[in-house]
Design a protein with these regions (language model features):
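Active-site beta-to-alpha loop of glycosyltransferases that engages the nucleotide-sugar donor
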Residues: 1-14, 31
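Short, acidic, metal-binding catalytic loop of nucleotide-sugar glycosyltransferases
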Residues: 14-23
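Short acidic/polar active-site loop segments enriched in Thr and Asp
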Residues: 22-23, 82, 122
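Short beta-strand/loop segment that forms part of the nucleotide-sugar
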Residues: 22-32, 54-57
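Active-site-proximal specificity loops/subdomain of glycosyltransferases
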Residues: 37-86
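Catalytic-site signature of metal-activated, phosphate-bearing donor transferases
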Residues: 65-66, 95-287
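Acidic metal-phosphate-binding loop of nucleotide-sugar-dependent transferases
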Residues: 89-93
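Boundary detector for helix-to-coil junctions that initiate low-complexity/charged tails
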Residues: 271-327
Length: 327
């Protein structure tokens, strides 16, 4: 399910349409308003993909796990597929082979062959989180693996597709399927996306409110953490040379297909890196001070309001007593 994924929808569609065929893609739109995104969805629909428009509310976004599980079950009865992958718009399907990462359909089919008809919940092996400041570099994670199903197995899904149940058994099987995940966009777009994902549960985006929501560890709490992070801290951690692995297979496939991907990365600064980071640090410090001042003013205004209300109530009490006595 996607909404207004301005820089990711076209690469996602082009890559998976080439890999799997557009007729095998089902795209759930959650009420996009962007003209370019709506046009991209219409093109995808005319090229053979199925675009589902009716789930457009915030509530439906929160309940997407059960909604998509029901959709898979209906497909199982009417138009079954061998496998069902639950992909977000920032996730790109690939596989791990003996010779490395592959983005080729024949290798993915070979990896999936032993899982045809599986009764288990199927899990991907890794996620490759991309580095938005350095092309071809990824952080590999094994935590919170995404789920997918073979035909007939889907029973239930959570919102993030990390936890699932099979209607045919209670086992889990780790496969050699992997996802490339482009969660981290250029900083400005990353903030817009995080705010959008949080808007179904938060209306106050002040620093004080975001910190309180983050501590609750509630729905999409990681988006609050993203919004609290300044650009200096954001960029600096991606420039750290430690913890990254080179994996050129996906962008090589993008080049082969003709997919533009420059917008998925932070624009290269014309300044020397040390100077760029120094300026970003100063800017971040100033912005945080402004946030603290706004928070102080907000708390001061609330205190004044409470005091004023209390004084008004006290001053009205004699008048009310006199009115009652006079009546």
């Amino acid at each position: 399910m996607q909404k207004d994924e301005t820089i990711l929808l076209d690469p996602w569609y082009s890559y998976h349409a080439n890999l799997l065929g557009p007729e095998n893609l089902f795209i759930f739109d959650n009420g996009s308003k962007s003209t370019s995104v709506i046009q991209s969805l219409q093109r995808a629909g005319s090229n053979g993909a199925t675009v589902i428009w009716e789930y457009s509310t915030r509530h439906e976004y929160r309940e997407r796990g059960s909604m998509i599980a029901n959709f898979i079950q209906r497909l199982d009865h009417s138009n079954p597929f061998d496998f069902y992958f639950l992909l977000d718009c920032d996730e790109f399907l690939a596989c791990q082979t003996n010779s490395g990462i592959s983005c080729q359909r024949r290798d993915i089919e070979r990896v999936l062959q032993p899982c045809i008809g599986s009764r288990d919940v199927l899990l991907i092996r890794h996620k490759f989180w991309h580095n938005p400041c350095r092309m071809h570099l990824y952080s590999i994670t094994n935590s919170s693996p995404k789920c997918f199903f073979a035909q007939g197995a889907c029973d239930s899904l959570d919102h993030g597709y990390h936890h699932a149940k099979s209607r045919l058994g209670s086992g889990e099987t780790i496969t050699n399927i992997i996802y490339f995940e482009f969660h981290y966009k250029p900083y400005r777009l990353h903030r817009i996306s995080s705010r959008q994902h949080l808007s179904c549960v938060v209306t106050d985006f002040s620093r004080r409110s975001l910190q309180a929501y983050q501590k609750k560890q509630d729905f999409n709490h990681h988006c609050a953490e993203d919004l609290l992070e300044g650009k200096f801290d954001y960029v600096r951690r991606f420039l750290d040379p430690q913890g990254w692995e080179r994996a050129p297979a996906l962008l090589a496939e993008f080049n082969r297909i003709g997919i533009s991907y420059a917008s998925l990365y932070e624009p290269k600064s014309l300044l020397p890196q040390p100077l760029q980071l120094s300026l970003l640090r100063i800017r971040q410090s100033v912005m945080h001070r402004v946030d603290e001042l706004n928070d102080l003013l907000y708390r001061g205004a609330r205190l004044i309001f409470r005091k004023t209300s209390w004084l008004m109530q006290r001053s009205l009490q004699p008048l009310l007593r006199m009115t009652r006595f006079g009546g």
